[in-house]
Amino acid sequence: DNWVDNCNGRLVVPGLGAYRMDKSEADWAVNDITDQIDYSRYYGGAGCAFFRCGNVLYNDKGLYKELRDNYYKYPAQLPPLTWLNDSVPAAPEGIKVERLDDELHLTWEKPVSEKQDLTYTVYYSLTDSIDTASAKSILATNIYGNELFLPIDVESERGYTFSVTASTRYRIESEP
């Protein structure tokens, strides 16, 4: 049976044993881990957890580089916990972009109607429309404040479109 088919609306996040890549453990190759990621994605897993972090970051077989370059290129939001609460928060208000010397300063206001703590995700695009369903559009996520500073290269400055969403502690995201 597929665990995802029997998860009762909960998230399935397989734990992958990156420590098994050590010669003293099982001497796995990088593809032993990436095959498990592919399998989890194919069956609808909500992501992967790696045990132990040091085995990912300092692995001499190149696991970190493989994950960074081919599996986790873009920032990602954590999946929503809809079984705990599915209330959609109001969208941030008063989004402004100002240029301050060699930085862009994005600011927004917490919606007046929201009493709970929120985190924010900033999306961007080089066109007038933003695909918020694509991780490629996420500039930053899990922001706790209401501002973001972005360094810019004055010589290659381009026009960007920005959008900001709010998320609850259950990771339910507002509309942009």
Model-predicted segments: where are they?
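Substrate-binding cleft of secreted/luminal carbohydrate-active enzymes
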Residues: 1-83
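Residue-level signal for short segments within beta-strands and strand-turn junctions
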Residues: 52, 110, 124-128, 166-168
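Proline-enriched interdomain boundary motifs that mark the N-terminal boundary
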Residues: 87-96
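Conserved aromatic anchor
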Residues: 102-115
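Extracellular low-complexity, O-glycosylation-prone stalks/linkers
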Residues: 114-138
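Short beta-strand segments within Ig-like beta-sandwich modules, predominantly Fibronectin type-III
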Residues: 138-145
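Short strand-edge motifs at loop-to-beta-strand transitions and within beta-strands
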Residues: 146-150
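Beta-strand-rich modules
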Residues: 151-174
